[in-house]
């Protein structure tokens, strides 16, 4: 969960509540408070935020087992700064998150008195410091920063009233670094920005689920440095840079170059080309800690002891066209992309353990490619009245067919699972009258392959899912209560067409991971916001 805050520009307070209901009456209530404060001399400021959310569980097929979990979360924090001088600033941030989620049946009972429960309670505390120093001519900038986050999780992932399916996880991350930027009037052939720096990242993970014989301890440390130079002019921008990292789980340092170029041959046309490279260390990630219920047992993810790093090389090429037609501003974008993955991570089903639980091993496939084209268009009368749409065609395939099930009759598959070939979006925003705004938005997801696992692997199958179009509408109206206080009322419908998965698994032997399509059913929502 990421929290993005902003630097305050004036004193303000905002209090809001949004409440939503599905057709069956399932409620989702979210209340938030935000405040910005500035000192009279504008040398100090703070942005405070807090929110409380409560969402009921949702049972689509009325089988007594939730298809969307219940949620109870509280978030609070702040971001503040103090200008220590005319050319220096100290910034500090803190956030706290308490998040509880539970799905399954008999949610009013303790987890070990249910047929299926997937439950997790996270307590997250994090913060950071950053100090920036500029020279009077703005040509030199030095920044140093450090942040720390501590995550504590108490969980239960179990079936059939298992008293031993409780778990505890601790995960703390420290990041520290420094960066220097030098703005040059000319370097070789054009004005340029030179940036270099160093960073240290340490993550300490301990995940315990003794009922499943799992006691994972993982320490991951990465330290590295980077350098980048950007040449810029009105018609040409060129960026070249590189990063070198040493991770304690990889034998040799990893060198990751990157380059980008932007060229404007004529006033209304921008051409771009880029190359980036990267890697993923051979370690456990958040998704590896999750446990799913399948066929009355659970599925667990383990790491291949010989897991190797995953490397990527990505290329992009795009063209932007801008044009004014009367009062309408037009923008068209066409983009092609290609990514090659070497030793790509892959989940391979293995033989069940002695308790009958499904075992998936994170191992390496030889490689994979992701390539496609993307088109976007926007027409705007002004910032409040515009229409925007985009479409992407993408192919994601492994270099060789991969085994996704241990079933004797299950064919291998080259296509990446859960990766649609087609997806897109559309958004229409307008202000038909003073203080009134309206929006219509939608996302399209094409067909994809989703695995459906059963207790007997010979029954496993790949589902070719249907396409989905998730359409939403929203209206809002501003009412000036006083010269400085405004109330906004809003209402709308999410997923108007109730585009939702039709073949959700049923009962206590369900595959809890067999989920696809829009995340929420048709939901009517109403809101009110006060700002001053």
PLM features per residue range, with description:
Residues 232-235, 332, 337-340, 361-454, ...:
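Gram-negative outer-membrane beta-barrel transporters
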């Amino acid at each position: 969960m990421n929290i993005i805050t902003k630097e305050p520009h004036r004193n303000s307070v905002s209090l809001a509540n949004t409440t939503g209901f599905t057709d069956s009456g399932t409620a989702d209530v979210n209340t938030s408070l935000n405040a910005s404060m500035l000192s009279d001399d504008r040398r100090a400021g703070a942005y405070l935020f807090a929110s409380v959310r409560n969402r009921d569980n949702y049972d689509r097929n009325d089988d007594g087992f939730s298809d969307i979990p219940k949620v109870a979360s509280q978030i609070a924090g702040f971001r503040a700064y103090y200008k220590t001088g005319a050319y220096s600033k100290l910034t500090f941030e803190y956030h706290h998150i308490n998040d509880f989620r539970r799905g399954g049946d008999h949610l009013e009972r303790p987890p070990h008195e249910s047929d299926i429960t997937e439950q997790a309670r996270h307590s997250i505390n994090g913060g950071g410091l950053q100090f920036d120093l500029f020279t009077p001519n703005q040509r030199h900038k030095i920044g140093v920063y450090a942040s720390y986050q501590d995550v504590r999780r108490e969980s239960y992932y179990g079936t059939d009233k298992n008293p031993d399916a409780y778990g505890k996880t601790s995960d703390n991350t420290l990041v520290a670094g420094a960066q220097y930027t030098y703005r040059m009037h000319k370097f070789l052939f054009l004005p340029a920005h030179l940036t270099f720096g160093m960073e240290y990242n340490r993550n300490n993970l301990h995940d315990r689920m003794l009922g499943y014989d799992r006691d994972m301890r993982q320490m991951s440390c990465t330290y590295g440095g980077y350098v980048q130079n950007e040449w810029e002019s009105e018609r040409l921008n060129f960026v070249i840079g590189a990063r070198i990292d040493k991770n304690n789980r990889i034998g040799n340092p990893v060198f990751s170059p990157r380059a980008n170029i932007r060229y404007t041959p004529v006033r209304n046309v921008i051409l771009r080309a880029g190359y980036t490279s990267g890697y993923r260390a051979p370690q456990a990630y958040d998704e590896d800690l999750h446990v799913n219920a399948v066929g009355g047992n659970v599925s667990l993810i383990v790491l291949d002891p010989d897991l190797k790093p995953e490397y990527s090389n990505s290329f992009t090429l795009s063209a932007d066209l801008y044009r004014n037609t009367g009062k309408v501003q037009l923008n068209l974008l066409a983009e092609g992309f290609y990514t090659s993955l070497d030793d790509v991570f892959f989940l391979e089903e293995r033989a069940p353990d002695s308790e009958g639980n499904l075992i998936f091993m994170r191992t390496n496939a030889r490689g994979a490619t992701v390539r496609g084209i993307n088109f976007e268009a926007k027409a705007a009368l002004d910032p409040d009245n515009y229409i925007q749409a985009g479409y992407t065609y993408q192919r994601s395939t492994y270099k060789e067919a991969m085994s996704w099930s241990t079933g004797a009759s299950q064919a291998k598959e080259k296509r990446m699972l859960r990766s649609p070939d087609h997806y897109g979006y559309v958004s229409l925003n307008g202000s038909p009258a003073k203080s009134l705004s309206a929006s219509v938005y939608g996302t399209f997801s094409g067909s994809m392959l989703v695995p459906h696992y059963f207790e007997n692997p010979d029954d496993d199958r790949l589902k070719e899912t249907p396409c989905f179009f998730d359409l939403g509408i929203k209206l809002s109206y501003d009412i000036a209560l006083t010269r400085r206080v405004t109330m906004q009322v809003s209402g709308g419908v999410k997923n108007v067409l109730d585009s939702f998965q039709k073949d959700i698994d049923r009962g206590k032997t369900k595959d809890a991971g067999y989920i696809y399509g829009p995340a929420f059913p048709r939901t009517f929502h109403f809101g009110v916001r006060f700002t001053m």
